[in-house]
C-alpha cells in the first residue's frame, strides 16, 4: 500500500482515509489546509491506486497494514484520524485494534458491520456490486441512475467513472462485501477518548444503524450532523469546514 506524506517536519500526525470509488486525491483540497501545521498521512488504498494496480483486500487487513506502516516509521501516536464512508469503516476497525495510540478520531458517514443473517448480507452485497459494476460497464449515464443526483454533480460522477475504468470487479465486490461485513475484535474497549461520528442531515435515516452501532460500541462518541452537504461531501465541497471541525475535535473542544 502506497502512503503519501505531507508536512513531514511537523510532529502532530493526522491520518486521512478516503471512501470507496475515489482515489487518495479525494483530499486534494484538504491537504494544503493541514500540511503547514501537521504531518499529513494519506494512504492510497489497495484497488484504488491508479499508479499501483491491485485489488482491494479487506477493512481488517488495511487497518492492520496502516498500523504496521505507522509503527515502522516510528509513529506510536497520532493526533487525529479521519475516515469517510469506507474510510470510516477502516477507522472503526483501527480504533478497535488499538495498535497505535489515537488522541482523536472522526468517522464521517462510516460504514459499520451489518447485524443481519448471513444470507441477507450476501443479497445486499450482490445488489451493491451490480449497481456499481453496471456503472463501470455503462458509464456515466448508468451512474447517474445509481447515485442520488442531489449528492453528486456531473463532475463528481465523471471522476467516479474514471476510477471505475481501472478498478477491478474483484475490488468492487470486496469493497462492499468487506465494508458491510468486516469483523471486529470481541469485547474491545477503544483507548481513544475523543471520537465523533459525522453524517449529513439528509442521510440521517440511512445512517441509523451505523449510528446505533457506534453508540453501542464506542460510548464516548459524540454525533454531529451537517446541513447542506451529502454523504462524503465535506472534503470536496467544504474543505475549510472539514478542517476547522477536525481541528476542533483534535483540540478536545465540544461540538459547536
Outline where the language-model segments fall:
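Active-site loop/oxyanion-hole signature of alpha/beta-hydrolase fold enzymes
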Residues: 41-82
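Conserved HGGG/HGGXW glycine-rich cap/lid loop of the alpha/beta-hydrolase fold
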Residues: 4-52
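Flexible "cap/lid" loop of the alpha/beta hydrolase fold
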Residues: 96-97, 102-132
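Gly/Ala-rich beta-loop-alpha elbow adjacent to hydrolase catalytic centers
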Residues: 83-91
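Conserved alpha/beta-hydrolase "acid-adjacent" motif
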Residues: 204-210
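Short beta-strand/loop motif that positions the catalytic acidic residue
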Residues: 191, 197-199
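Conserved alpha/beta-hydrolase catalytic His-Asp/Glu region
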Residues: 116-118, 136-189
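Catalytic histidine-centered segment of alpha/beta-hydrolase-like enzymes
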Residues: 226-240
Amino acid at each position: 500500500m502506497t502512503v503519501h506524506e505531507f508536512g513531514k517536519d511537523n510532529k502532530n500526525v493526522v491520518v486521512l482515509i478516503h471512501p470507496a470509488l475515489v482515489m487518495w486525491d479525494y483530499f486534494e483540497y484538504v491537504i494544503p489546509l493541514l500540511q503547514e501545521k501537521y504531518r499529513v498521512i494519506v494512504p492510497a488504498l489497495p484497488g484504488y491506486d491508479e499508479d499501483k494496480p491491485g485489488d482491494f483486500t479487506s477493512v481488517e487487513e488495511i487497518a492492520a497494514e496502516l498500523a504496521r506502516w505507522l509503527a515502522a516509521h516510528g509513529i506510536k501516536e497520532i493526533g487525529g484520524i479521519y475516515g469517510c464512508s469506507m474510510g470510516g469503516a477502516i477507522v472503526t476497525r483501527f480504533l478497535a485494534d488499538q495498535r497505535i495510540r489515537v488522541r482523536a478520531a472522526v468517522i464521517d458517514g462510516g460504514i459499520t458491520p451489518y447485524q443481519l443473517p448471513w444470507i441477507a448480507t450476501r443479497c445486499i452485497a450482490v445488489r451493491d456490486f451490480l449497481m456499481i459494476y453496471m456503472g463501470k460497464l455503462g458509464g456515466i449515464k448508468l451512474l447517474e441512475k445509481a447515485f442520488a443526483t442531489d449528492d453528486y454533480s456531473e463532475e463528481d460522477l465523471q471522476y467516479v467513472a474514471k476510477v471505475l475504468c481501472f478498478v477491478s470487479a474483484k475490488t468492487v465486490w470486496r469493497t462492499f462485501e468487506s465494508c458491510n461485513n468486516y469483523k471486529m475484535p470481541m469485547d474491545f474497549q477503544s483507548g481513544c477518548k475523543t471520537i465523533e461520528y459525522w453524517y449529513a442531515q439528509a442521510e440521517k435515516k440511512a445512517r441509523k444503524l451505523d449510528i446505533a452501532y457506534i453508540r453501542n460500541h464506542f460510548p464516548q462518541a459524540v454525533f454531529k450532523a451537517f446541513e447542506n452537504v451529502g454523504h462524503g461531501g465535506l472534503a470536496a465541497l467544504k474543505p475549510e469546514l472539514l478542517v476547522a471541525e477536525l481541528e476542533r475535535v483534535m483540540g478536545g473542544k465540544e461540538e459547536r
